């Protein structure tokens, strides 16, 4: 999906509001994914899945940092996420559907924390952005 100039503005504005809460929101989204979609836990056999575990916080921070990098490279997501795509496709072998599940959980988390800013237009822009990130992350599976 092509991101319009309005989408890019919505994404950057929304991400600025996330700011220093990125790691916290990332961890909340990861925890929400594990609770809502328990099969996703199979990729993390060494994790402590209790609320607020350090492993969930650390992975949430990684997710947030990767998305922050992607927001900074909206015109070159494949270049910005190439290493991460290789990791997930060749080493971790994560089922591509899990990216969609995490994206959904992230949208729910952001809507929960920023309800007044999470307008239909912002929701649509973030959804397109996360779909594009998912597409890039799964592009090397083929």
Curated annotation (Swiss-Prot):
Cystine bridges: none
GO molecular function, a single term: organic acid binding
Identification of the protein by name: Hemoglobin subunit alpha-1/2
Record-listed heme b binding positions: 88
UniProt keyword annotations, A-Z: Acetylation, Heme, Iron, Metal-binding, Oxygen transport, Phosphoprotein, Transport
Residues with PTM Phosphotyrosine: 25
In-chain residues carrying the UniProt-annotated modification N6-acetyllysine: 17
Phosphothreonine found at: 9, 109, 135, 138
Residue positions, PTM N6-succinyllysine: 8, 12, 17, 41
Tree of life domain: Eukaryota
InterPro entries in UniProt: Globin, Globin-like_sf, Globin/Proto, Hemoglobin_a-typ, Hemoglobin_oxygen_transport, Hemoglobin_pi
Function: Involved in oxygen transport from the lung to the various peripheral tissues.
GO CC list: blood microparticle; haptoglobin-hemoglobin complex; hemoglobin complex
Binding, O2: 59
Origin species: Oryctolagus cuniculus (Rabbit)
Subunit comment: Heterotetramer of two alpha chains and two beta chains.
Expression sites by tissue: Red blood cells.
Similarity field: Belongs to the globin family.
Modified residues (Phosphoserine): 4, 103, 125, 139
GO biological process terms, semicolon-separated: hydrogen peroxide catabolic process; regulation of translation
Domain spans labelled Globin: 2-142
């Amino acid at each position: 999906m092509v991101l319009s100039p309005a989408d890019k503005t919505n994404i950057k504005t929304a991400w600025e509001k996330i700011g220093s809460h990125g790691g916290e929101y990332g961890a909340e989204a990861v925890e929400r994914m594990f609770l809502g979609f328990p099969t996703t836990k199979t990729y993390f056999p060494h994790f402590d899945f209790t609320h607020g575990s350090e492993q969930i916080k650390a992975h949430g921070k990684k997710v947030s940092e990767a998305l922050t990098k992607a927001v900074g490279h909206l015109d070159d997501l494949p270049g910005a996420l190439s290493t991460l795509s290789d990791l997930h496709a060749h080493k971790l072998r994560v089922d591509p559907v899990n990216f969609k599940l995490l994206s959904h959980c992230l949208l729910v988390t952001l809507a929960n924390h920023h309800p007044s800013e999470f307008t239909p237009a912002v929701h649509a822009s973030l959804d397109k952005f996360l779909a594009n990130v998912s597409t890039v992350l799964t592009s090397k599976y083929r």
